[in-house]
């Protein structure tokens, strides 16, 4: 398992935390949005430009 930062681009913008976690098999621990640190809820929507702190469960690119 690896901890990483991912820059949210248009692939993930508008998707919920739950959608991204299920699709990519990872856990999102924190969202960095402008000057805010956001603790994600399952229905939190990602915005383009967010940075997410994740732990990957499987092998990812």
Regions found by a protein language model. Name each.
Residues 5-61:
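Cytosolic Rossmann-like ligand/nucleotide-binding regulatory domains
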